[in-house]
C-alpha cells in the first residue's frame, strides 16, 4: 500500500472535506481516501501532528474490501459502514466499490456516524459520475 499524493482529484477532495465538516463539524480530525493499492490523507486538522502510522491504519481499513464481499449475501442485508470506538476518538469507514474513505473524529454519535457515512457515500458516487 503506497501513499499517493495525486490519488484523488482536487474537486472530489474539496467535496469530501466539505461533506465531512458539515456532518461532524469541529470534531473532524482527519479524512483518508484509499483504494486496494494506495491511499491519500486529504484532510488533517491543524492541531494534529502528521506523525501517525497512517500506512498501518490504511492497511487495516483496506481489509474492508474483503469484508464487503464476505457479507454480500448476509441475512442482515448489505454491509453499510464500520464505526470503531477508541479511548480518544472514533474511526468511521465507508467503502464504495473499489474505493473507500475513513474519517477520524473526537466524538461522534451513531446518528452522526450514519450522517457522515451517507455524506461520504453520496460524494463518492457523485465524484464517480463526474470522472
Region annotations inferred by a language model:
Residues 1-131:
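Non-catalytic interaction/Regulatory regions outside core domains
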Amino acid at each position: 500500500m503506497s501513499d499517493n499524493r495525486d490519488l484523488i482529484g482536487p474537486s472530489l477532495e474539496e467535496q469530501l472535506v466539505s461533506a465531512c465538516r458539515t456532518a461532524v463539524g469541529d470534531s473532524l480530525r482527519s479524512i483518508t481516501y484509499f483504494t486496494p493499492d494506495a491511499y491519500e490523507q486529504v484532510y488533517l486538522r491543524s492541531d494534529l501532528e502528521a506523525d501517525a502510522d497512517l500506512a498501518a491504519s490504511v492497511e487495516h481499513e483496506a481489509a474492508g474490501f474483503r469484508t464487503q464481499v464476505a457479507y454480500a449475501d448476509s441475512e442482515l442485508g448489505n454491509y453499510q459502514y464500520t464505526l470503531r470506538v477508541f479511548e480518544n476518538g472514533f474511526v468511521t469507514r465507508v467503502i464504495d466499490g473499489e474505493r473507500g474513505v475513513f474519517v477520524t473524529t473526537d466524538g461522534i454519535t451513531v446518528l452522526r456516524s450514519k450522517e457522515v457515512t451517507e455524506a461520504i457515500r453520496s460524494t463518492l458516487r457523485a465524484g464517480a459520475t463526474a470522472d
